[in-house]
Amino acid sequence: MYINPKEILETIQMVRMEHLDIRTVTMGISLRDCSHPDIEVFNENIYEKITTRAKELVRTTNEIQSLYGIPIINKRISVTPIAVAAESCRAPDFVSIAKTMDEAAKDAQVDFIGGFSALVHKGATVGDLKLINSIPEALKSTEKVCSSINVATTKTGINMDAVGLMGSIIKKTADLTADRDGIGCAKLVVFANAPEDNPFMAGAFHGIGEPECVINVGVSGPGVVNAAIRELENPNLTEISETIKKTAFKITRMGEMVGREVSRRLGVEFGILDLSLAPTPAIGDSVAAILEAMGLERCGAHGTTAALALLNDAVKKGGAMASSSVGGLSGAFIPVSEDAGMIEAVRAGALNLEKLEAMTSVCSVGLDMIAVPGDTPASTLSAIIADEMAIGVINRKTTAVRVIPAPGKRVGDSVEFGGLLGNAPIMPLSNFSSETFVKRGGRIPAPIQSLTN
């Protein structure tokens, strides 16, 4: 890969002034060879494998950060979905597995570990149900463990039994972490069409089709894109799209360079580069700010969905030109609590849940880090999930829900999670019930592929 001096100077500017960073270097580790009927033996096996494989991850990424001067914010691990790896365990629940994962993550000095996960888009096995029912206690008892459940795919439809169950699981998780504003729910995501190579939390897991061990990288550059657009003089939307493509190209080249060097030093296969524009609470490092730079008075105004579609498509086009290893989610994230512009838009009354839902039809993932009143019924949470899953299934894309029913909070309040998770204003929901619909259960069939209107 040839990189000229001008690109190096541009990258320095991006890092120093525009919040460019590598959001995560995530090591994916297969645990399929760790299976054992005795959960104690299984826990020993996964602890040994995780800590052995990841023992040099943090040191190596820190060295590369110092060498290139490019911040690497998080070092993470993803593992085989535990519901798969632990299927043969005879224990009544999998909480001890989550605790073992947490200990392994702490010993490896990584920020998060993902993969306390199950894939139940067509139905649930005994192991799947053990894992799902263990989630509230597991997230209460751990610091670094993240959980994800895939409940729908375009090929199979939506498992409404699983959707109904996840509303209750989210509610219970919030209650068990009420002393921290329900932060357990910030580490739990429900997917449609979940990718197997996603490096971002809380949805990362090491897919069944993945190799023994792999490095996946997630870049982040909303501030860079925002600055590039604002430097243009009265551009039309075609010119804005071209600028975003060129900027995404540069960001991607930097990310691939770092990812391949980490892989080379660790002797591990390089997997994918996720192009997702992941915002932070820092001013200017915001997807909402990009949309406003295009000409919207506030994110959430009419035209927001179109602007986001332009952004998402241009990022993918620019990134795909720069790398043949693009994967994961790759687009623009719209997590409310993690984006200063989104937070301000909600507080100004410009952005509501219904508009966010429309935006998810064209963005990278879905309803992300949404805080809602603590007294929200579990059935309403399930209905929110069902709506979002439908968007993903019909549009053949990944969608997800990460929602926090903040205990004791009402509309007008806010919750503070700190760090990259930021803070979130409590958003209002419909007062009308979806309970009967959710309780019907069953499966919403896969959509027809030939008649697409």
Swiss-Prot record:
Gene3D superfamilies: 3.20.70.20. CDD domains: RNR_PFL_like_DUF711. Pfam families: DUF711. Signal peptide: none annotated. HAMAP family: UPF0210. Belongs to the UPF0210 family. This is UPF0210 protein Mbar_A3181. It comes from Methanosarcina barkeri (strain Fusaro / DSM 804).
